[in-house]
From Swiss-Prot:
Organism: Methanocaldococcus jannaschii (strain ATCC 43067 / DSM 2661 / JAL-1 / JCM 10045 / NBRC 100440) (Methanococcus jannaschii)
Highest taxon listed in the record's lineage: Archaea
Name of the featured protein: Uncharacterized protein MJ0337
Taxonomic classification: Archaea, Methanobacteriati, Methanobacteriota, Methanomada group, Methanococci
Length: 262
């Protein structure tokens, strides 16, 4: 829990008022902290935006650390952020904790919960064709599974991580549908499909196989923007930034299966 006093909360609320739709535009609000160049520091970046929270003068944080330096801050999605810095957990489990954190970051990007994420996937991928429409009358779970297995094989030279399947809602329904043999395409691919992401934001009837791997997915850099509101003295000094979006670092690691729906 990170508490803002009433005045600070009003400043944050004022900056957020012009926002109509987070899929179109958003602003980031960072708690400012100078970071020594020789110190490895990580940011906590998730906050639930809730008008009631502002009225109470507090905000609730979920910790998703992202490595930063004195260069512009890096964040990971399109919702309001209030951030603070902390070090990674030290001790015998430090490496394990780092692996968990990076997997968590890539997972958030892979979820493709907004148009920025879908745009990033659609512009940076390796495209292949589906063997048949997944909703075709003669299509079986085997055919759907083979499309996905073929895509995973292409990904493996770039990443061995488990994947998210990001696809239109109707395509996901086909993927989950149980065939006459008593199994679904999911049953045949669940060893490497970690997330199933149905979305209505994909409009070209394609599906994406996305490794949950920070080597494949990254985030854009948020840059400071002074024009939002007049700077005022607060208990916490804020940095106001424009929205940033997910980025694909290695497009060969993202497989787009085209025309999975007829």
């Amino acid at each position: 829990m990170m508490a803002l006093n009433e005045y600070d909360a009003q400043i944050v609320e004022q900056a957020m008022k012009p926002i109509l739709d987070s899929n179109l535009f958003s602003r980031k609000i960072f708690q400012k902290k100078k970071i020594p160049e020789d110190v490895e520091v990580y940011n906590l970046v998730q906050v639930v935006f809730d008008e009631n929270a502002f009225k109470k003068g507090s905000m609730e944080l979920t910790e998703v650390p992202i490595k930063t330096t004195t260069s512009p801050f890096t964040v990971f999605d399109i919702n309001l952020k209030v951030t603070k810095a902390r070090r990674f957990v030290e001790g015998p489990n430090a490496d394990y904790n780092k692996a968990q954190i990076f997997e968590g970051l890539a997972k958030v990007v892979a979820r493709a919960e907004n148009q920025y994420s879908i745009d990033a996937l659609s512009k940076n991928n390796t495209a292949v064709g589906a063997s048949a429409s997944w909703n075709g009358a003669d299509t079986t779970p085997d055919k759907i599974a083979n499309d996905i297995i073929d895509a995973k094989t292409k990904i493996e030279q770039y990443s061995n991580a488990k994947c998210a399947l990001v696809a239109p809602v109707d395509a996901i329904a086909c993927f989950r549908k149980i065939g006459t043999q008593g199994f679904s395409a999911y049953d045949e691919t669940k060893d490497f499909i970690k997330e199933i992401i149905p979305t209505n934001l994909i409009t070209d009837k394609s599906a994406y196989l996305v490794p949950i791997d920070i080597a494949i997915l990254q985030m854009g850099v948020a840059v400071e923007a002074d024009q939002f509101i007049e700077k005022k003295a607060t208990q916490v000094e804020f940095i106001f930034t424009e929205a940033i979006s997910p980025m694909v670092k290695e497009k060969n690691g993202i497989i787009k299966i085209q025309k999975v729906l007829g």
